[in-house]
Swiss-Prot record:
Record SUPFAM superfamilies: Dehydroquinate synthase-like
Pathway: Metabolic intermediate biosynthesis; chorismate biosynthesis; chorismate from D-erythrose 4-phosphate and phosphoenolpyruvate: step 2/7
Main location group: cytoplasm
Subcellular location: Cytoplasm
Keyword Lyase among UniProt keywords: yes
Organism: Lysinibacillus sphaericus (strain C3-41)
Required co-factors: Co(2+); Zn(2+); NAD(+)
Catalyzed reaction equations: 7-phospho-2-dehydro-3-deoxy-D-arabino-heptonate = 3-dehydroquinate + phosphate
Disulfide bonds: none
Residues bound to Zn(2+): 181, 243, 260
Identification of the protein by name: 3-dehydroquinate synthase
Family to which this protein belongs: Belongs to the sugar phosphate cyclases superfamily. Dehydroquinate synthase family.
Name of the gene this protein is made from: aroB
Length: 363
């Protein structure tokens, strides 16, 4: 399966398949045959689990750079080490870099590619469900202790290869985390799709064909939005549904303690509560959605681990904040997102409602 992504700066495709890595890479033969060197950035966990398959199916010689797993790779230190590695290996503007791993590896690799010699080509080979989202659209970044993804660039890959073979060995928590972004895509685009997900016995056990179709839907939603707004000036903000409150939880906990998708799910419920005040959504739906999330194993304990005051400083660092006012992505109804300025007083009121709802549902 192919999903085209057409932005103002670059056109490319997302290739989806199962056990097709060699075939997919050969799609880029015209570009790759002109390259002088190949570099693969990955993390220790991915390389141990999937390195043999990758080496057996990657048709070129390459040098590998091993990163720590998860958000630990998105630091100044790892960014600097990656640049040093490329310089020492005599990487040139004719070289190609491959991001082989989850969303964090893709974010770091993309930012390295965007800034090394002012830009070298790279291809995303995501290995997690979560990365179906982050690998598409050209957002690259590293973290700062004061905020997630605060240092980065918009830089599109030459392509994205999603081989569902990698999902076969994902831990349950990683599947759950990635599926949260799929659910988010359904919420901003298609009420029937969300109803289908909420009616499923579980969103944790798709077979390979079902997973590929779900990923294709999610990628199509993102591709359409990114084509209209590459640098997040307008509709691309809709993709941040659940991320304002979710990022605050994630940052307060310390990156990696609460999985990104877990934090997004926490944020999605918060946005539903806030949306009740400005659209057609109501408390019974919000409660049903929370129960659906709990049934699928999403943890919400982190909400009660921090006071609203502890979350405030992280909320105010959200990249959508304008002139000191928080901008939340809300839903008029499922499939119809919008952005609204919300003051801290109202945020605190909704935070209190959230804690009350959790006390009711998590009994």
């Amino acid at each position: 399966m192919r999903v085209p992504v057409a932005t103002k700066s670059h056109h490319y495709e997302v290739l989806l398949g199962h056990r097709f890595l060699t075939e997919a890479i050969q799609t880029y033969a015209d570009q790759l045959n002109k390259a002088d060197k190949f570099f693969v950035f990955t993390d220790a966990h991915v390389w141990e689990a999937q390195g043999d398959y990758f080496k057996a199916n990657f048709p070129y010689d390459f040098e590998v750079f091993i990163l720590p797993g998860g958000e630990a790779c998105k630091t100044f230190e790892q960014y600097y080490a990656a640049q040093t590695f490329l310089l020492e290996q005599k990487c040139s503007r004719k070289s190609f870099v491959f991001a082989f791993g989850g969303g964090a590896v893709g974010d770091l690799t993309g930012f390295v590619a965007a800034t090394y010699m002012r830009g070298i080509p790279f291809i995303q080979i995501p290995t997690t469900i979560l990365a179906h989202d982050s690998a598409v659209g050209g957002k690259t970044a590293i973290n700062h202790p004061l905020g997630k993804n605060m240092i980065g660039a918009f830089y599109q890959p030459e392509g994205v290869i999603y081989d569902t073979v990698f999902s076969e060995t994902l831990p349950v928590r990683e599947i759950r985390s990635g599926t949260a972004e799929l659910i988010k895509h359904a919420m901003i685009s298609d009420s029937a799709w969300l109803e289908e997900l909420m009616a499923a016995d579980s969103v944790m056990h798709f077979n390979q064909q079902e997973l590929a179709m779900q990923l294709k839907k999610g990628i199509e939603v993102k591709a359409k939005i990114v084509a209209e707004d590459e640098t997040e000036q307008s509709v691309r903000k809709f993709l941040n549904l659940g991320h304002t409150y979710g990022h605050a939880i994630e940052a307060a906990a310390g990156y990696g303690k609460v999985a990104h998708g877990e934090a997004v799910m926490i944020g999605l419920v918060y946005c539903l509560l806030l949306s009740e005040r400005y659209g057609e959504l109501n408390r019974p739906f919000t409660k049903a959605f929370l129960q659906f999330a709990v049934k699928n194993g999403y943890p919400f304990e982190a909400v009660n681990d921090y006071t609203f005051e502890q979350l405030t400083s992280y909320l105010m660092k959200d990249k959508k904040t304008e002139y000191g006012i928080l901008q939340f992505v809300l839903l008029e109804k499922i499939g119809k997102p919008f952005v609204r300025a919300i003051d801290l007083k109202e945020c605190k009121e909704v935070d209190a409602e959230y804690r009350e709802l959790l006390a009711e549902v998590l009994v």
